[in-house]
UniProtKB/Swiss-Prot annotation:
This is Acetyl-CoA:oxalate CoA-transferase. The active site is at H233. Homodimer. GO terms for molecular function: acetyl-CoA:oxalate CoA-transferase; CoA-transferase activity; protein homodimerization activity. The gene is yfdE. Induction: By the acid response regulator EvgA. It comes from Escherichia coli (strain K12). SUPFAM superfamilies: CoA-transferase family III (CaiB/BaiF) (SSF89796). Its EC number is 2.8.3.19.
Length: 381
């Protein structure tokens, strides 16, 4: 960080983080990345469940570390009067309280939204749960796969002749985490005008449903749920994964101009004037035969040749990379998307803001109650 750079736009912000597992900690990690002081309040015992999740490096859980590095850790038993008083003092000074318990848990602990407002009228109280704090499913337990199953996203993921599959990453958790971050940021901005706090209520179900895009559009337009399409796009073609002589590549043509350029690169210019392929709508209708024409040509040479040739004419094209290959890309390095936190390689901050530091090294994830003595002393009165 240079002398002219800040730690981030949230430098000086105090966040009390009661979130656990993935959904909530992902959202508060974004706040931490942007300069906020995040104090993770963990229960007695083993703390956040993910401390016990693999994989491990040097005895540390990577699962926990990926979404909790740079945060402080204190263990508080909120059923204990002394610990509860420390927690209340923390709340009095905090800007944000984040949690992802089932609805009703904070009330049982004595910290309803009404009580929190009395303690600190400017507090942003952010809740994230499977189905939110309202509606008939609000008390239902949820993990990522439950939400993927119920939101419709699993039913539209995969191939038409195969069963539905879970999206490869924990999409519902991560969608919820991103919206948790966005909700907190929005509420903080609103506080600048109102001078009062707010309750942010995020549901993983809502978040995932809002990401459905094609699925929702198709249903609204036709009254029917869409079929699974594999790697194809419902409204654009060619927009798929194609086999070459040695490796698959992905090609995306979103308009007639790109399709014409692709045909030029593949020396298939006769396809441009073929009435079956003269528009996106027609190419989608006839994409099976179109894919045969394209793959027949692609299979004559190696992927490397086609990647260069197609890229040269300005058509979006890419190899299918493994994680190991993706993290070694010069682009990954140039964007500082791999950093070191506590001696362990971690994902970098995807939010780049001018004038704010984008460090290559961050503090690692704290051990359980690592900052307990310091925090108890700081907030003892």
């Amino acid at each position: 960080m240079t002398n002219n750079e800040s730690k981030g736009p949230f430098e000086g912000l105090l966040v009390i983080d009661m979130t656990h597992v993935l959904n909530g900690p992902f959202g508060t990690q974004l706040l931490c990345n942007m300069g906020a002081r995040v104090i993770k309040v963990e229960p007695p015992g083993h703390g956040d469940d993910t401390r016990t999740f693999g994989p491990y490096v040097d005895g540390q859980s990577l699962y926990y570390s990926f979404i909790n590095h740079g945060k402080e850790s204190v263990v508080l038993d909120l059923k204990n009067d002394h610990d509860k008083s420390i927690f209340i003092n923390m709340l009095k000074q905090a800007d944000v309280l984040a949690e992802n318990f089932r609805p009703g848990t904070m009330e049982k602990l004595g910290f309803s939204w009404e009580t929190l407002q009395e303690i600190n009228p400017r507090l942003i109280y952010a809740s994230s749960s499977g189905f939110g704090h309202t509606g008939p499913l609000k008390d239902a337990p949820a993990y990522d796969t439950i939400i993927q199953a119920m939101s419709g996203i699993m039913m539209e993921t995969g191939y038409p002749d195969a069963p539905p599959v879970r999206v490869g990453t924990s999409l519902a958790d991560l969608c919820g985490g991103v919206y948790l971050f966005s909700g907190i940021v929005s509420a903080l901005y609103g506080r600048e005008k109102s001078q009062r706090g707010a309750h942010v209520d995020i549901a993983m179900f809502d978040a995932t449903l809002s990401f459905l895009e094609h699925g929702l559009m198709a249903y609204i337009a036709t009254g029917k749920s869409p079929q699974r399409l594999g790697n194809r796009h419902p409204y654009m073609a060619p927009f798929d994964v194609f086999n070459t002589q040695d490796k698959p590549i992905t090609i995306c043509c979103g308009n007639d101009k790109l399709f014409s350029a692709l045909c030029q690169a593949l020396e298939l210019t006769e396809l441009v004037n073929d009435p079956r392929f003269s528009s996106n709508i027609l190419r989608v209708q006839n994409q099976a035969i179109l894919k045969q024409y394209i793959e027949r040509t692609l299979k004559t040479q190696a992927a490397e040749v086609w990647l260069a040739r197609i890229h040269e004419v300005g058509v979006p094209v890419a190899p299918l990379l493994s994680v190991a290959e993706a993290i070694k890309l010069p682009q990954t390095q140039a964007r500082n998307m791999l950093i070191e936190a506590g001696g362990i390689m971690m994902p970098g901050n995807p939010i780049k803001i001018s004038g704010c530091a984008d460090p290559h090294v961050m503090p690692g994830a704290a051990t359980l109650d690592q900052h307990g003595e310091q925090i108890r002393q700081e907030f003892s009165s």
